Amino acid sequence: MQKIMDSAVAGLGGYSNGGYAVAINPHTGGIYGMAGVYRDPNTGKTTVDPAGAINQSITMGSVVKPAMIIGALKSGVITPDNNVLTDMPIKVKDTPVKGSWFNKSGGANVALTASDALMVSSNSYMMQLAMKEAGFKYSYGATLTMPTSIFKKLRNNFNEFGLGVRTGIDLPGEVSGLEGKSTAKYIGSALDLSYGNYDSYTTIQLAQYASILANKGYKIQPHLLQSIRANGKDGKMGAVKYEVKPNITGVIDVPDSYWDIIHSGMYKVVHGTSQYATGTAMKDINPAIAAKTGTAETVYKNTDTITLSAISYAPYDDPQVVVVVAFPNLASDKSSINMNTLKSIYEAYWKDVQSSDGYKTSK
């Protein structure tokens, strides 16, 4: 896995900081692989940096959207049977127009279910959810009068999914991420928070979060240690003296109908027929995966960059493994590195860790 990340980062230039990846068992928290490369954007020099997966805070982008939808369902602003909103550019007073990547000007306004909003990665849908959760009735050009408590409400929901809080991994140096400012002056940034373009998280947090999505609600502590064995008399490993057991640190207890929306949407990200489905470059991965891609608009030294990420699990209908990746501060011409890297990691997983026999066909 480290070789895969080395190869991926080797082709990067500009202000790229490198990249990070984690593969994890969504049912036990056991880490199959954790890899990373730090790239000095000033010199281009790279350093092997797997610990960056737990101590580098990155603005991850749209990968947060499944959590945003679950939060909105829990709040009751949408329901499993009533969740259609129109994707349209959002304009509030004294703030530039914010919109979805495929509908910046309003020429592609379209009604979306929550599941389809994931498929096409609708920023507009998430902003509308945030405004609904804040009790703000939106109209074009209106003054955004949301209370600052919306920051806490959105963050509390993300925290339940492991975003913005330490996972408790059995390594020193883990950080919780970074929060943007939350005063009334920055209330417009609550809209950015709703689609992942404000706060920063770590790659290990993405792994725990994606595991929660895969296992339908169980927040499990990630761990590298699997077991401790005694020394055998012949120099070989002896009996198991201690074995790490899954440590469930929280449960998101919601109806299966909520998870069905998320799983359907993440499947359609990869296998959907919409021209705007964001992950179809991964449709040939076998066994089939479900995923959510992420793109954050970032800035480095006054230069616009993008940060690409992805969360995924496979097989989509019986998750055995979660794979997540993050590549901060890229030039826009590297727009598929997140998906290409996922492909390579899955190929290695099914070859070296677990046989894909029995998972070749979908249910």
List PLM regions with ranges:
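N-terminal leader/targeting segments and the immediately adjacent pre-domain N-terminus
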Residues: 1-12, 362-363
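Beta-lactam-recognizing serine transpeptidase/beta-lactamase-like catalytic domain environment
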Residues: 9, 19-56, 70-327, 363
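Feature responds to low-complexity, polar/acidic, surface-exposed segments characteristic
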Residues: 14-16
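Short, gly/Ser/Thr-rich active-site loops of penicillin-recognizing serine hydrolases
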Residues: 235, 240, 247, 339-363
